[in-house]
Swiss-Prot record:
Disulphide-bridged cysteine pairs: 44-59, 51-68, 58-86, 70-84
A Pfam family reported for this protein in Swiss-Prot or TrEMBL: Toxin_35
Domain of life: Eukaryota
Domain notes: The presence of a 'disulfide through disulfide knot' structurally defines this protein as a knottin.
Family label: Belongs to the neurotoxin 19 (CSTX) family. 04 (U1-Lctx) subfamily.
GO CC entries: extracellular region
Protein name: U1-lycotoxin-Ls1c
Amino acid sequence: MMKVLVVVALLVTLISYSSSEGIDDLEADELLSLMANEQTRKECVPKHHECTSNKHGCCRGNFFKYKCQCTTVVTQDGEQTERCFCGTPPHHKAAELVVGFGKKIFG
């Protein structure tokens, strides 16, 4: 009986050790991922800034992520170029207005 308890204790120790090693590896990978996300967040394009070269890099606003909105600009030479900026789409503006109004009414 004593041998069985020793073997079970040994197995539990080995399993907990191996799982903690896996958890440590997982935590390290997760930490690296979070650091990469933080770096990306620092490099996002603010509202009203140009996003022509980085159309998916707009920052987050109060409720929604800003969208890269593009327009075609005709230069004096007659060339058409696309210019983009990060902004809030009209349906997001409406949602923010409703939420703000609701907060004023309901506290």
